[in-house]
Curated annotation (Swiss-Prot):
Protein name in UniProt: Thiamine-phosphate synthase
Binding positions for Mg(2+) per the UniProt entry: D65, D84
Family under the similarity heading: Belongs to the thiamine-phosphate synthase family.
Species, as recorded: Bacteroides thetaiotaomicron (strain ATCC 29148 / DSM 2079 / JCM 5827 / CCUG 10774 / NCTC 10582 / VPI-5482 / E50)
Positions of 4-amino-2-methyl-5-(diphosphooxymethyl)pyrimidine binding: Q32, L33, R34, M35, K36, D64, T103, K132
Entries under NCBIfam families matching the protein: PRK00043.2-3, thiE
The keyword Endoplasmic reticulum appears for this protein: no
Purpose of the protein: Condenses 4-methyl-5-(beta-hydroxyethyl)thiazole monophosphate (THZ-P) and 2-methyl-4-amino-5-hydroxymethyl pyrimidine pyrophosphate (HMP-PP) to form thiamine monophosphate (TMP).
Domain of life: Bacteria
Keywords: Magnesium, Metal-binding, Thiamine biosynthesis, Transferase
Residue positions binding 2-[(2R,5Z)-2-carboxy-4-methylthiazol-5(2H)-ylidene]ethyl phosphate: T129, T130, T131, G165
Pathway(s) where this gene product acts: Cofactor biosynthesis; thiamine diphosphate biosynthesis; thiamine phosphate from 4-amino-2-methyl-5-diphosphomethylpyrimidine and 4-methyl-5-(2-phosphoethyl)-thiazole: step 1/1
Amino acid sequence: MVSLQFITHQTDRYTYFESALMALEGGCKWIQLRMKEAPCEEVEAVALQLKPLCKEKEAILLLDDHVELAKKLEVDGVHLGKKDMPIDQARQLLGEAFIIGGTANTFEDVVQHYRAGADYLGIGPFRFTTTKKNLSPVLGLEGYTAILSQMKEANIELPVVAIGGITREDIPAILETGVNGIALSGTILRAEDPAAETRKILNMKRIIK
C-alpha cells in the first residue's frame, strides 16, 4: 500500500497536536511533527504528547529538523530540509536505527541525499503551497516523472514521497508517476472533518493500488 505522511500545521482551528491527532484518528500511520517557527521546548512538549499516541496507533513519528531532540526523545526519526542539518551529519549522530528523510527538488538533490544515507526522499513541491515558505520551483507531474526516470537509470532505489500543495483529486495522477507515498497537510486540515478526510484518502489509495 502506498503510504500517507501527514505533516502537522497550526491553523486558526487546530493546534499542531490537534492536527496530528485527527490524522491519527483517520488512520494515518506516519506523522511528521513540523513546527518550524516554534522554540525547541514547544516542539519537545508536543512530541512528548504525540509519542505514546503514535505508539498506540502503530504510527511512525518523525520530527522536522530537530535531530538532537529526536535522539533524546527516541522518536522514530527526522525529516531534514535543505537548510537543516546535513543528512550525513544527522546519520552520525543518530546511527542506523533512526529514519532520516530529506527534502529534494532536483535529481542532483536526490543523488546528494542518497550518498549521504537518507532512508526516503520528500520530493516537491508538486505545486505552490501556502503551508511552506521559501518554496523551490514547482515540479508538477512532469517533474516527478523525470526525476524518477533519472533515479531508475542511476540505480538509485529510495522511497519517494510527493509533497507540496497536493489535493485529493491530484493523488491518482501523482501515484501514476511511480512515487511511493504522498505527504499532505493543508488538504486534510481544510476539510470540514479532517479525520474523515484522512480516511477517504486512505481508502481511495487502497482502491487505486
